Amino acid sequence: MTAANLLEFDLDALAAFCEQLGEKRFRATQLFRWIHQKGQSDFAQMSDLAKSLREKLAGRAVVRPLAVLSEHVSADGTVKWLFDVGGGNAVETVFIPENDRGTLCISSQAGCAVGCRFCSTGHQGFSRNLSTGEIVAQLWHAEHQLRARLGTTERVISNVVMMGMGEPLQNYAALLPALRVMLDDHGYGLSRRRVTVSTSGVVPMIDRLREDCPVALAVSLHAPTDALRDDLVPLNRKYPIAELLEACQRYLEAAPRDFITFEYCMLDGVNDSEAQARELLRLVGERGPVGRVPCKINLIPFNPFPASGLTRSSVARVQAFAQLLVDGGLVTTVRRTRGDDIDAACGQLAGEVQDRTNAQARMRRAPIAIRPIDSAVQRRADAAPSGSATETTR
């Protein structure tokens, strides 16, 4: 009989497993704490469990971590791990330290089928979904390794963002139990406000998440019009912007925050003009297709990679774009790039993927031909003073 990997179970599933062993629910709670709060994988070391239970577990269960293929530490303290998930696939996980928090960026798939043109993961194609245990194992490894390295028993990771490799909402069956493990007070005890699911816009699953486990939501918007977003985020052809914004409004009815974060990767000459900033203001404002959408805009400097055919907007252009949004009444932040010296910044995670979607071949086609920005607009943007928008990290 194959041993059950206990990292696959949320507390309810672990309780059901313990009942199959003839044990009561409180034993599952004890076991859950040992695994997730103390990082213990050896049942023999779980001293407050009955010896009979430890013997049962030794024959029928295991806490199976992911094998670490590599670890890189950036000059700014960012840490990137490459984990082997079998079948020739590897996924990446990134820890971003800050003075007031520690954020872990977790992958949900080996590769990604969405194929956003500015994302290195999308250019790698898609192999498979990760299991709940493979998602949780990234947090388990990072939290307990960082504690050991820092010589502390206090929690190191305060925030989790599902912004690594993959589209989380296209792996919902594995994502949901993983979120419950993160939020459980007997597990990692994270606040719903501090766990963020980022999606390219899988509308039906946004509604499911609202019903099942509403956490903070970030939406990869990246364009103010369907015509442009169809090319940058191909999923838009199935779920256009108006449908996506309606789903965001519904989500806010149950969300732990009173706004949606819209992520907007700044691409030189593609989506960064003054006119497009004004279109974005209109899109989420009272006169937009679904009325006002309470939101924060997070502008993300593009992290170039050769296959994209795209380049990063200038600092001045980003500042000018941000200032127009701020002047229009939108809370706007500019993400500060972290870990780019180890390819751990936003959009750079690629891992190693056995592509089943032929994405690498499809991505070789030329990017969409975008009309150049008016030269006068270009000069004004490049000469613009620093905006008042704030900086954020991932």
Curated annotation (Swiss-Prot):
Classification via InterPro entries: Aldolase_TIM (IPR013785), Methyltransferase_A (IPR040072), RlmN_N (IPR048641), RNA_MTrfase_RlmN (IPR027492), rRNA_lsu_MTrfase_RlmN/Cfr (IPR004383), rSAM (IPR007197)
Enzyme Commission number(s) from the entry: 2.1.1.192
Subcellular location field: Cytoplasm
Main location group: cytoplasm
Record-given protein name: Dual-specificity RNA methyltransferase RlmN
Residue sites binding S-adenosyl-L-methionine per the record: 166-167, 198, 220-222, 303
Enzymatic class: transferase
Active site: 92, 346
Residue span of region Disordered: 374-394
Chain sites annotated for binding [4Fe-4S] cluster: 112, 116, 119
Keyword Methyltransferase: yes
One Gene Ontology MF term: tRNA (adenine(37)-C2)-methyltransferase activity
